[in-house]
Amino acid sequence: MTPEIITIQPARVPNAVRMPLWIRQNLGSDAHYGKTSDAVQANRLHTVCEEARCPNRGECWSRGTATFMLLGDTCTRACGFCSVKTGKPDHFDADEPRRVAEAVMALKLNYIVLTSVNRDDLADGGAGIFAATLRELRLRDATIGVEYLTPDFRQCQDDAVRIIMDALGELPDGARSDLVWGHNVETVPRLYQTARKGSKYQRSLDLLAKAAQQSGVEAKSALMLGLGESRAEVLAVLRDLYSAGVKRVSLGQYLRPSLNHLPVLDYIHPEVFTEYEHEARAMGFAWVKAGPLVRSSYYAEEQQGDTHA
């Protein structure tokens, strides 16, 4: 039976349901957790693990992996679900790519996820920093796996794709020339006006389609559930993503960062996530992760070596 479609409520309203046991998770305290934290702080960097209060931070950091957030810690948009601070960024750090690469080398990672805040104040949306970080990483380690999780590059998608693909094509002989390019649609189209102000569903699909068309690039996206979307809406988004050329997808539970953010309307049972995973695989997605604590970069390192040439 299709669940009732619920209209999302404004911030400060209590969650509609209590958090179930399957959601709760302790912060990791493995020795590698401290090593990852130290490397991030020593290089004056930001991770989405911290800024977005990811529930898997302890687990991932204890494995010695992290998702580095480029272009500072201030976003030019204000999505209703996100805890990253918003405002007018006060600087542009051209040295950030070098410091990210040095932190990655210090941690001896073989797969790195790079994301960023939205920087609508920049002509290229920040694409140049993504490209420069890719170069810095593969100049130091020609075999390192790199995954992007980019904004939608509003007003400059074509330029952003060109900048990034130029960097990929100019790497030294012997360096990997592949890339996973992720961009999250986050939610169903009906909820964009409330959950993703400043973003457009079709714009996100357009970027994913452009990324999927590039040689050596595999497109990836993610959905968070629990904002009142219906099963039919979720399946429709999965079909749209697959039609756009996306081959990798993840689905996870929305967890409210604070009372100033959108309330959780439903906690999706793990069995329902399993059903969505089966549906996505049946549609043809090559890689699927679905579960309450899954995030777009969760166990991303498992994917390395799978991108097409």
Annotate the PLM regions.
Residues 118-123, 189-195, 257-263:
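A short acidic, helix-capping loop that chelates divalent metal ions and anchors anionic groups
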Residues 1-67, 102-105, 132-143, 159-177, ...:
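Auxiliary Fe-S-binding modules of radical SAM enzymes
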Residues 112-132, 228-233:
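Conserved glycine-rich "GG(E/T)P / GGGxP" loop and the immediately following alpha-helix
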Residues 13-23, 59-96:
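Canonical Radical SAM [4Fe-4S] cluster-binding loop centered on the CxxxCxxC motif
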Residues 66, 70, 81-94, 147, ...:
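Active-site mouth loops of central-metabolism enzymes
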Residues 85, 117-119, 149-154, 185-188, ...:
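Active-site beta-loop-alpha junctions enriched in small/polar residues
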Residues 113, 181-184, 250, 289:
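Conserved beta-strand positions in the central sheet of alpha/beta enzyme cores
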Residues 86-113:
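Conserved alpha-helical substructure of the radical SAM core
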